[in-house]
């Protein structure tokens, strides 16, 4: 079997086609990452006019800071809850739509609506519903004797930001899961049904293994989403409180850099977060992807 390769009339045309993407990558990704790495090794004054090379002192100070370590473990817990809860809920809804015959179009449209809402707006929406004094959901919980006040209860605050973050990401996950389920040949599903496999068994024995590559892709995407893109939700919903119970690494970087004007500490934290995400992604590609290959 021979494979054909595209032939360009000019030897410079391939480089010209790739150049815009390379420029965007360098300007918006590589350059800022390099700047963060450089500032993490400096002691910079709040106005950025002068700096002094201090080596790894900023990193040493980080890991002796109890507030930073608390934010680190809060980030791990928050990211795990957002990632796995979002994937499970989205997969459940996608599986339901895959089996629904009547009204499936309306159901699909309804599931895609949260993706059109900005993260900060999603947070404000759920703040209204969970408002301790006038919220519809808190009023319902009060009827059962449950007192809700996420401004004073750290567990409730964590639940609120996780819930809002998952709700915002459901549409994205749902779209990929539903497309993956729809791509499974109907002949395989019908053959399994003829062999006596029920809907639940067909899903776990047939559908789930076949959509494993998509599940792995969404695992990586949701992990990055939980680490970085949930900042507007946390900022609008709890501002990292109460008592830093919902302060993640990305929010602490913002607070140190833009509120505390400690550019060196903020840069060091961003470098640690960057390498943490890189390590987790590499581990996933190395050990998880090998388990999603199928013939």
From Swiss-Prot:
What ranges does the Periplasmic topological domain annotation cover?
33-80, 131-157, 229-262
Q: Which organism is it from?
A: Salmonella typhimurium (strain LT2 / SGSC1412 / ATCC 700720)
Record-annotated membrane-spanning stretches: 12-32, 81-101, 110-130, 158-178, 208-228, 263-283
Q: Specify where it is mainly localized.
A: membrane
Subcellular location, record wording: Cell inner membrane
| SUPFAM superfamilies hit by this protein | MetI-like
GO terms under biological process: transmembrane transport
How is this protein named in the record? sn-glycerol-3-phosphate transport system permease protein UgpA
Stated role? Part of the ABC transporter complex UgpBAEC involved in sn-glycerol-3-phosphate (G3P) import. Probably responsible for the translocation of the substrate across the membrane.
- Pfam families cross-referenced by the UniProt entry: BPD_transp_1 (PF00528)
Mapped to this chain, the residue ranges on the Cytoplasmic side of the membrane are 1-11, 102-109, 179-207, 284-295
């Amino acid at each position: 079997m021979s494979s054909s390769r595209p032939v360009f009339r000019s030897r410079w045309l391939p480089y010209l086609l790739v150049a815009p993407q390379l420029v965007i990558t360098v300007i918006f990704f590589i350059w800022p990452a390099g700047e963060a790495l450089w500032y993490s090794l400096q002691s910079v004054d709040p106005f950025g006019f002068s700096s002094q090379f201090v080596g790894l002192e900023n990193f040493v100070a980080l890991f002796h800071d109890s507030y930073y370590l608390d934010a680190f473990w809060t980030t791990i817990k928050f990211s795990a809850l957002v990632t796995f809860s979002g994937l499970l809920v989205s997969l459940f809804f996608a599986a339901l739509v895959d089996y629904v015959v009547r009204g499936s179009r309306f159901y699909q449209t309804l599931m895609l609506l949260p993706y059109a809402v900005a993260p900060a707006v999603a947070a404000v929406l759920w703040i209204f519903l969970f408002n301790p004094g006038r919220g519809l959901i808190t009023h319902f919980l009060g009827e059962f004797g449950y007192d809700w006040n996420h401004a004073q209860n750290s567990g409730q605050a964590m639940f609120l930001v996780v819930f809002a973050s998952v709700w915002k990401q459901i549409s994205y996950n749902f779209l990929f899961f539903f497309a993956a389920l729809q791509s499974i040949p109907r002949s395989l599903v019908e053959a399994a049904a003829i062999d006596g496999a029920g809907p639940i068994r067909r899903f776990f024995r047939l559908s789930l293994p076949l959509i494993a590559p998509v599940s792995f892709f969404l695992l990586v995407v949701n992990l990055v989403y939980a680490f970085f893109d949930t900042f507007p939700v946390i900022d609008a919903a709890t501002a990292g409180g109460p008592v830093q119970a919902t302060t993640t690494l990305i929010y602490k970087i913002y607070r140190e850099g833009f509120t505390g004007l400690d550019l060196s500490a903020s840069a060091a934290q961003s470098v640690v977060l960057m390498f943490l995400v890189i390590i987790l992604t590499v581990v996933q590609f190395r050990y998880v992807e090998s388990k999603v290959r199928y013939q």
